[in-house]
Amino acid sequence: MNKDQSKIPQATAKRLPLYYRFLKNLHASGKQRVSSAELSDAVKVDSATIRRDFSYFGALGKKGYGYNVDYLLSFFRKTLDQDETTNVILIGVGNLGTAFLHYNFTKNNNTKISMAFDVNQSKIGTEVGGVPVFDLNDLELHIKDEPVAILTVPAVAAQSITDRLVSLGIKGILNFTPARLNVPDHIRIHHIDLAVELQSLVYFLKHYSVLEEIE
């Protein structure tokens, strides 16, 4: 992403992979052009937001014609660095971590988990989903230039592990623990607490209708 594109709103940046995935499906089906209304219906983002998102990148479409699928796909592939592979490490090979290793982002050609770490001696030295599992105590011996880590460890251990990751040059952390981690300002961290998300969903189901949210 170039300097100008790095200034786009974070909400827009989060939607780009969603657009890219849908465009890949369109391309595979042989569709040559798509309207913002069709995109809106597919990705569940209103068409005005899609047009505004796309406007940050200049003229990507033509009024009355829509968007050329091949052009958009090529543009977003370059914007999202899809031709460069990002190696990710995973800390914690429990149930959730194991699921990640078996899945290993098979739909994302540019992202893969290259190694995992755990403290369980029965898992150390094995492979899960084709990914080698190393001793967490040897973390510093294995991390080279991997920029991203996924945390699926007990909350009590999350901060100390995070401190080690930061000292090793990790730039981004996907945190699946309930802990709210303290990191330096230059570190990007995304918290995903599945229990909180589920509780929030149940609350909205009980107290809000879908129509009320739309209004």
Curated annotation (Swiss-Prot):
The organism's place on the tree of life at top rank: Bacteria
One function term, GO molecular function aspect: DNA binding
Pfam families in the record: CoA_binding, Put_DNA-bind_N
Location of this chain's protein in the cell: Cytoplasm
A GO BP entry: response to redox state
UniProt entry tagged with the keyword Transport: no
Keywords: Cytoplasm, DNA-binding, NAD, Repressor, Transcription, Transcription regulation
Binding site for NAD(+): G92, V93, G94, N95, L96, G97
Function comment: Modulates transcription in response to changes in cellular NADH/NAD(+) redox state.
PANTHER family: REDOX-SENSING TRANSCRIPTIONAL REPRESSOR REX, REDOX-SENSING TRANSCRIPTIONAL REPRESSOR REX 1
Entry similarity comment: Belongs to the transcriptional regulatory Rex family.
Quaternary structure note: Homodimer.
Protein name: Redox-sensing transcriptional repressor Rex
Native source organism of the sequence: Bacillus velezensis (strain DSM 23117 / BGSC 10A6 / LMG 26770 / FZB42) (Bacillus amyloliquefaciens subsp. plantarum)
